[in-house]
Structures are given as C-alpha cells and as structure tokens.
C-alpha cells in the first residue's frame, strides 16, 4: 500500500504515530469507559490514533476525555471530520492532539490497525497495515 496523505486543521497541536482505531460516531459520555479507555463497542482507545468521524453527546464528555488522560488510557491523538466544542474542550484540558477537517475519504480508507502518523502542521499520513 502506498502512503496516503491528507491535510487537516490542527486544533490542539502535537505529533503522534500509532495504530488507528476507526469509529464512525462516538459519545465520550456513556460510550467510553474512562477507567479502561474501551468503547461500548469493544474498541480500545489507549495508545492508538483515534479516527472518529463524528462525535455527539453531553458536555460531560470533555471530562471523560480528561479522565482518559489522567488514567493513562487516552488515545495518542484524535482525528475528526469536524470537531465539536465538547471534544475540543476535552482535548485542550488533557493535552491530546486534535485535528479536524479530514475528508470522508480518509474515514473510508483507514482501517483499525493501520499505522497513522500525525504531524504538527496538520499532515496526516496513513502508512498502511503493520508498518513500523
């Protein structure tokens, strides 16, 4: 697989690289265990680049994101089509890199376990399955 490159908008800057976990829609409050970092669908967020197409839910979601970081089970970064204020506030509080503006194609092509590299300038590279 050739490296796929996408441009995104940095909201909370930082760099990250790791395996992707892909989620179409997520409410951090009620669908993510802040102690384990596992979603109600059984997907772990800890140590992964979370590609979450869209989010929804309560303002408590910001505190769940912060709790994930405090408990050592936060994602390395969060990539979204369009970040909402709840996720932005949570990532600012927790210092988790957050990028949005990724096109629908990104969420259609990236798969769980694909290695993703996020650069501070907003460049997102999908390196493919099992790439070091």
From Swiss-Prot:
Catalysed transformations (reactions): (R)-5-phosphomevalonate = (2E)-3-methyl-5-phosphooxypent-2-enoate + H2O
Keyword Lyase in record: yes
Gene Ontology terms: biological process: isopentenyl diphosphate biosynthetic process, mevalonate pathway
InterPro entries given in the database record: PMDh-S-like, PMDh-S-like_dom, PMDh_S
Pfam families in UniProt: AcnX_swivel_put
Temperature dependence: Thermostable. Treatment at 90 degrees Celsius causes a loss of most activity, and treatment at 100 degrees Celsius results in complete inactivation.
Active-site residues, Swiss-Prot/TrEMBL: 58 (proton acceptor)
EC number: 4.2.1.182
Pathway listed: Isoprenoid biosynthesis; isopentenyl diphosphate biosynthesis via mevalonate pathway
Keywords recorded for this protein, A-Z: Isoprene biosynthesis, Lyase
Activity regulation summary: Neither the addition of 1 mM Mg(2+) nor 1 mM Mn(2+) has a significant effect on the activity, whereas Zn(2+) causes almost complete inactivation. Strongly inhibited by H(2)O(2), but not by EDTA or iodoacetamide.
pH effects: Optimum pH is 7.0.
CDD domains xref list: AcnX_swivel
Enzyme class: lyase
A molecular function GO annotation: hydro-lyase activity
Keyword Hydrolase assigned: no
Assembly and binders: Heterodimer composed of a large subunit (PMDh-L) and a small subunit (PMDh-S).
General function of this protein: Component of a hydro-lyase that catalyzes the dehydration of mevalonate 5-phosphate (MVA5P) to form trans-anhydromevalonate 5-phosphate (tAHMP). Involved in the archaeal mevalonate (MVA) pathway, which provides fundamental precursors for isoprenoid biosynthesis, such as isopentenyl diphosphate (IPP) and dimethylallyl diphosphate (DMAPP).
Protein name: Phosphomevalonate dehydratase small subunit
Lineage of the organism: Archaea, Thermoproteota, Thermoprotei, Desulfurococcales, Desulfurococcaceae
């Amino acid at each position: 697989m050739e490296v796929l490159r996408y441009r995104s908008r940095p909201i909370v800057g930082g760099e990250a690289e790791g395996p992707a976990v892909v989620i179409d829609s997520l409410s951090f409050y009620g669908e993510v265990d802040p102690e384990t970092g596992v979603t109600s669908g059984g997907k772990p967020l800890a140590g992964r680049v979370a590609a979450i197409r869209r989010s929804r839910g309560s303002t408590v979601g910001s505190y769940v994101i912060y709790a994930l970081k405090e408990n050592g089970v936060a994602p390395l970064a969060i990539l979204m089509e369009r970040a909402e204020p709840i996720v932005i506030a949570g990532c600012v509080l927790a210092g988790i890199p957050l990028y949005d503006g990724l096109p629908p194609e990104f969420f259609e092509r990236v798969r769980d376990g694909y290695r993703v590299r996020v650069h501070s300038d907003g460049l997102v590279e999908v390196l493919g399955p099992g790439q070091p």
